[in-house]
Structures are given as C-alpha cells and as structure tokens.
C-alpha cells in the first residue's frame, strides 16, 4: 500500500543559512534509504533555499522538491501530507537536525505498538550553534519510553510538530490536516486532532 516506510515533510522558507545541516542530518539516518522519502516543500522563499533543495535532490534520490506560492507553514505541511507515500509521516523544520538513528527508532517503535498508538514523540535537545540549552519542560513528564495517553491532562502538552512527532499515514483523504486559519499553536491543535 505504501511506497516508503517513512515520509519526512520539511517546510522550507528563507532558510539557506542552515538548510544544509538539516538535509545532511537526513542523509545520515540509519533507516534504509529505500524506505525513506523527504519532501522538501519551498513556501515561496526569496533567498537561495529552493536552489539548495534542488541541488540535494539532484544528488540524492530520497529528496523530492516542491515549490509553492507562500501560504504559510500549515498549508505547506498539508501539501506534504497529501503527497506523502510513507507508512509513517514525520515533520522536520528546516532549522532543525535529527540524530542519526531517530527515524529508524521511531519507525521501529511504531511497528511494535502499531495498534496501540496514533502518534510517536521523541526528545528535543535545543542547541544554538554549539551551545546546548536546558531540555524542554515536557521531559519532566516523559521520563521513559512508553505509551502515553494524550487525553490525560498530565500528558496533553508533550507534543509539537516542529521536529518531534510522527503519525500514521491513513491514506488519501483520511489524514488529519493542519488548521490553516491559526497563526500559532497549529501544531498543538494538530496533535490533539490526531
């Protein structure tokens, strides 16, 4: 049914200074490259971001490039959802990177708990350049790997789509989409909707 095991949606907008780091982190993933597609969706960038995307796509088959008129991050992610051909869909902002085994670990966890869960989240380690910052407050709640109920008030604030959630691809026309009317917190609403 699905062509790939994992689809990564990367909204791209005026990010030429850090886009290569993001894309290089995807090339280092331990998941098999034939199980991976990366949708680079340019949202009307005015800098060289689209050119960088095209360069990577020419050299590496995992990258697929799309160019849209500026519509905002939610519309860009929705376009990605509609074009994703992976069993699982994850999101990565163009100024973020993943550790090398992230996608394989997430896909394996989903495989083991497929019937129990709708969404997988994983740790964010904030850096600015080489400087590491304190962990996000949510890690006071998420102390171990496991299955958490997001309807439980204790755990309802642990997700965001910037770079640390993965969802099941339910197939054409069945996936939850982002609310394009929201200027912020669209990711939190999306997670609750999932």
What is the predicted role of each segment?
Residues 15-29:
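Short, well-formed alpha-helical segments that are part of the catalytic scaffolds
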Residues 104-177:
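Flexible acidic/His/Gly-enriched loops in nucleotide-sugar-dependent glycosyltransferase catalytic domains
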Residues 89:
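Short aromatic/hydrophobic "clamp" motif used to bind/position activated sugar donors
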């Amino acid at each position: 049914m699905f062509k790939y095991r994992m689809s990564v949606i990367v909204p791209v907008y005026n990010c030429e200074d850090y886009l290569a780091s993001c894309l290089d982190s995807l090339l280092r993933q331990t998941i098999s490259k034939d199980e991976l597609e990366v949708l680079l969706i340019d949202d009307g960038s005015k800098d060289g971001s689209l050119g960088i995307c095209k360069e990577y796509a020419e050299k590496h088959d995992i990258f697929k490039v799309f160019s849209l008129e500026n519509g905002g991050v939610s519309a860009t992610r929705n376009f990605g959802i509609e074009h994703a051909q992976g069993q699982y869909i994850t999101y990565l902002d163009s100024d973020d990177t993943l550790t090398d085994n992230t996608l394989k670990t997430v896909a394996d966890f989903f495989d083991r708990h497929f019937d129990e869960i709708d969404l997988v989240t994983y740790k964010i380690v904030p850096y600015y350049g080489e400087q590491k910052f304190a962990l996000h407050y949510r890690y006071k709640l998420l102390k171990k790997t496991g299955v958490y109920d997001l309807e439980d008030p204790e755990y309802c604030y642990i997700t965001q789509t910037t770079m640390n959630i993965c969802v099941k691809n339910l197939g054409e026309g069945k996936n939850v989409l982002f609310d394009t009317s929201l200027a912020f917190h669209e990711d939190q609403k999306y997670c609750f909707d999932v």
